[in-house]
């Protein structure tokens, strides 16, 4: 199989089975592309993860774009991202059609009941493997712990990441660094797009597209941050959605596989049908392709300068700290009784002791969840 066809095959499959949000997506990519296929080493994977945390946009999608480029060049960059996004987009479009047609959402509580604890095990296993590579010495270990604590305390993700990078950079001997270029890249384009999208009025495809383009270009952080942006624009400023419609859209984005940014697909369908769904999806994801392509030349320079390399090391462990905080928060919601605790423990043991594909664990968890719900209906 050619590298490009391999990129298409891998990311189409991940786009179908990658439930659980960015942390779980990244864990699955590590298992498939580091452990199984050996496209990159753990050190390279962590560097890419650190770089995606410094630019706006959905981290897991940007990892797919980066990894596609490493495997198959420019076309791999484009198709890696597209193939990861398209399955989720099609699923969300189908759910949006059903929502409009019947005024409600298909019930998936049984599947999610069994899938969520398996996702927690997958994320923990990946985080352990990445931490063994990234956390080198007491300074970086301390940065990991502090980053996790700050994230749990509600400190903004961007402050945690740049703070950890800055502290790590300050403790190495003075050398010329290029870390400032990352910050410039992260803020220059979003400022222009934000200004361009500051328009209001009736529901028009142009206005909707510009709003989603702005969100994709400036948004750091979790799905909760996405919810805040969407509410400010579509509920409060433009008045195009109700709070209930927005919450339903976010729920669909969270329970379907692939990037949670496909919430935009659902909203686009509600506002302008099939055309709106496609335009909203393209607009919110397009900045990620631009940022990844623009930031790729920075990675060798970041690793080539000692201070900049230390900055990236700090960002990497802070990203893992954020991942730990998210896993703790998700785990409290996922492991709710003895059965879900047993599912999480069994999945963790299988992941550590065997090379079982996480897709089979997710399928087993979903089937057990459906059976349990059927017995207790």
Locate predicted features.
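Multi-pass membrane proteins that catalyze or facilitate reactions on polyprenyl-/lipid-phosphate substrates
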Residues: 1-55, 66-256, 260-377
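Conserved beta-loop-alpha segment that forms the PLP phosphate-binding cup at the N-terminus of a helix
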Residues: 59-62
